[in-house]
């Protein structure tokens, strides 16, 4: 027991460093894309392929990663993903042509997606119920810290001739440190040595030796046996509502709102984005501290309700403020991306430019549209939807206009914080708890693939949705979706706070319909307490 604090610290480092690598790789392309375009003369389509190749690799990993995690174990999957990431970073750092860049990005995307699934499962199985929420949520904290770290590094290396090579190479550092931590930890809950290894950490939560474990196939996820269908409904519902509430798109308009309230110029916009990222890190830290105290359901309900109010507020402000949007994509652009992955954070990813360059727009997104336009030598547009706020504002309503813009900024800050408290960290924590160990990797990967697919769908449909119903109604639609998500969480998502994985397993096996989860949870805890008191 004397080694327990050290082991818990190693578990925390695995979760935090895994998230840091994930967040850094998501954000690094925002600072590297412009120098890559200048060095390789990338066209608009080539830039979109370069940005989207990471998403493609991540989607591939979500399709096959579950089988790798269940067959070879969680720790081996993480170590293997780190090896792929190191290879991808090396390819990117030494790349001399677009195909090598695409191969490197594809490899990195595969690695971070596989690692994100394996890390959450590995840590959730390795520690007891009292530490599980905090340690798994540290992965989300790592993502936000990694993105902030990429902001600073991109800003420092923006003027360096080969700065983009160093940007890609720095991702190897947290991956190497995580691998070192893994070598000092047990293999995990699977394998013959697992009960002996986990005794110091989980105590009575470990499986009894000699107990015959059930075998599950992938199709069992859709059957009623052992409550598997209920688990699948809960898992898919959480990942889909995480995306359908508009998280991949809301922050595409962040830089325009920043400019509207006075953040003019490249450096000011970068600092404003860092401020937004700092708010997100703070909210994630709050969620990490509360997840084992307040519970998973409470954070999900609170976060989703706050998201519904804040995104609806952005929509209402959009009715009052004249905002125009239009897709544009030039070969020379200040491109940035915002991608929300497992355990994803939804943080604005913003690139910093050398002082001599000027941009009319600061935000971009993954593949949205390609317009056939001639390449202009001056950077005048950005990837993705851009809000035109350059129209003159009459002198008389200037105060009202300023208040509305600040209201939109506050709503966006609240939205980011609400996501970081609820869907951001808790979704992947719940997914790592509700499935049996024998199929946990495949189930987690199955839900993760829907998360990536929904992210891509929301991103690709954003411009068409705005063209059909307008910007304000688009945000109000996201608010309505958040209300539906609130009802889903209240009715179907169980509370897993303070329960061992075995107790969560029993809860699903004995409940035929998820609507009974809240009542059954209270009864289960009551009997557990009576049993403990009588035993003492």
From Swiss-Prot:
Single GO molecular function: D-glucose transmembrane transporter activity
UniProt keyword annotations, A-Z: Cytoplasm, Membrane, Sugar transport, Transmembrane, Transmembrane helix, Transport
InterPro entries: MFS_dom, MFS_sugar_transport-like, MFS_Sugar_Transporter, MFS_trans_sf, Sugar/inositol_transpt, Sugar_transporter_CS
Residues in compartment: Extracellular: 37-48, 104-107, 154-166, 254-269, 320-402, 464-468
Membrane topology qualifier: Multi-pass membrane protein
Chief subcellular location: membrane
Location relative to the cell: Endomembrane system; Cytoplasm, Perinuclear region
Cellular component, GO, one term: endomembrane system
Record-annotated membrane-spanning stretches: 16-36, 49-69, 83-103, 108-128, 133-153, 167-187, 233-253, 270-290, 299-319, 403-423, 443-463, 469-489
Reaction(s) catalysed by this chain's protein: D-glucose(out) = D-glucose(in)
Cytoplasmic-side segments: 1-15, 70-82, 129-132, 188-232, 291-298, 424-442, 490-536
Keyword Ribonucleoprotein on entry: no
Known role: Facilitative glucose transporter required for the development of the cardiovascular system.
Family of this protein: Belongs to the major facilitator superfamily. Sugar transporter (TC 2.A.1.1) family. Glucose transporter subfamily.
Descriptive protein name: Solute carrier family 2, facilitated glucose transporter member 10
Gene source species: Mus musculus (Mouse)
Organism taxonomic ancestry: Eukaryota, Metazoa, Chordata, Craniata, Vertebrata
Name of the gene encoding the protein in the UniProt record: Slc2a10
């Amino acid at each position: 027991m004397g080694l327990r604090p050290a082991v818990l610290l190693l578990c925390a480092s695995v979760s935090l460093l895994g998230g840091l690598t994930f967040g850094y790789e998501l954000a690094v392309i925002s600072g590297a894309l412009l120098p890559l375009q200048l060095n390789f003369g990338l066209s608009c389509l080539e830039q979109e392929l370069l940005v989207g190749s990471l998403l493609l690799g991540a989607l591939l990993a979500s399709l096959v990663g579950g089988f790798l995690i269940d067959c070879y174990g969680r720790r081996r999957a993480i170590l293997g993903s780190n090896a792929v990431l190191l290879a991808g970073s090396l390819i990117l750092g030494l790349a001399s042509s677009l195909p090598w860049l695409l191969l490197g990005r594809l490899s990195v995307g595969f690695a971070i997606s596989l690692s994100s699934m394996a890390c959450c499962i590995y840590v959730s199985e390795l520690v007891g119920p009292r530490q599980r929420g905090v340690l798994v949520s540290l992965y989300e904290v790592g993502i936000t810290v990694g993105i902030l770290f990429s902001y600073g590094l991109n800003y420092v290396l923006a003027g360096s001739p080969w700065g983009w090579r160093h940007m890609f190479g720095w991702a190897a550092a947290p991956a190497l440190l995580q691998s070192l931590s893994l070598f000092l930890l047990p293999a995990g809950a699977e394998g013959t040595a697992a009960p002996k290894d986990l005794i110091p950490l989980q105590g009575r939560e470990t499986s009894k030796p000699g107990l015959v474990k059930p075998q599950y196939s992938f199709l069992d996820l859709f059957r009623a046996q052992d409550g598997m269908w209920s688990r699948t409904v809960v898992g898919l519902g959480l990942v889909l509502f995480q995306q359908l509430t508009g998280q991949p798109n809301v922050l595409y308009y962040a830089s325009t709102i920043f400019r509207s309230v006075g953040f003019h110029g490249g450096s000011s916009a970068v600092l404003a984005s860092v401020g937004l990222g700092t708010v997100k890190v703070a909210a994630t830290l709050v969620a990490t501290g509360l997840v084992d105290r307040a519970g998973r359901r409470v954070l999900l309900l609170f976060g989703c309700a706050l998201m519904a109010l804040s995104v609806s507020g952005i929509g209402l402000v959009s009715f009052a403020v004249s905002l125009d949007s239009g897709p544009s994509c030039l070969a020379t652009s200040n491109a940035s991306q915002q991608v929300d992955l497992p355990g994803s954070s939804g943080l604005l990813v913003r690139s910093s430019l050398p002082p001599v360059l000027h941009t009319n727009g600061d935000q971009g997104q993954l593949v949205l549209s390609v317009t056939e336009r001639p390449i202009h030598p001056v950077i005048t547009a950005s990837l993705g939807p851009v809000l035109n706020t350059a129209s003159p504002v009459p002198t008389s309503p200037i105060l009202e206009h300023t208040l509305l813009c600040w209201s939109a900024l506050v709503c966006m800050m609240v939205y980011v914080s609400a996501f970081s408290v609820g869907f951001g960290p808790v979704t992947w924590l719940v997914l790592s708890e509700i499935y049996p160990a024998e199929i946990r990797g495949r189930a987690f990967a199955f839900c993760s693939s829907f998360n990536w697919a929904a992210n891509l769908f929301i991103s690709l449909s954003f411009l068409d949705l705005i063209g059909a119903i307008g910007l304000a109604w688009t945000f109000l639609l996201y608010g309505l979706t958040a209300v539906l998500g609130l009802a889903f969480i209240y009715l179907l998502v169980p509370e897993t706070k303070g329960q061992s994985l075995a107790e969560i397993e029993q809860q699903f096996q004995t409940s035929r319909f998820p609507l009974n989860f809240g009542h059954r949870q209270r009864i289960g805890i009551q009997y557990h307490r009576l049993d403990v008191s009588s035993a003492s």
